[in-house]
């Protein structure tokens, strides 16, 4: 079994960490953040309260930004290789363009 590693999520003002297993935690207290699943798409997300507003953030973007950061990632999609949007393990995710993401779906009959 691959060891779970934690890295800071670079695009949040809060000190949050994402694991290679697709978990999110508070980097100070080390307590896990509650993760929800969108009923319409199956994507996993969490909510934070920043500047008196609720901000929703997708787990797959956090995992990739924390463990596989690249320049310009804000403009890229994250592809779930196995088509399971709730599988946010780093081994199942890859950066891609919107076009590449669509081609991946078409090639695999999705």
Which residue stretches match the model-derived regions?
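Conserved recognition-core residues within compact binding domains
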Residues: 1-77, 82-110
């Amino acid at each position: 079994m691959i060891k779970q590693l934690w890295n800071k999520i670079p695009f949040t003002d809060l000190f949050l960490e994402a694991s290679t297993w697709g978990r999110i935690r508070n980097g100070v207290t080390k307590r896990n953040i509650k993760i929800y699943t969108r009923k319409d798409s199956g994507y996993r997300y969490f909510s934070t309260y920043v500047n008196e507003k609720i901000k929703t953030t997708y787990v797959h973007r956090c995992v990739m930004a924390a463990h596989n950061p690249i320049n310009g990632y804000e403009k890229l999609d994250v592809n779930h290789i196995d088509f399971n949007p709730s599988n946010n393990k780093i081994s199942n995710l890859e950066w891609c363009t919107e076009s590449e993401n669509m081609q991946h779906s078409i090639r695999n009959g999705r």
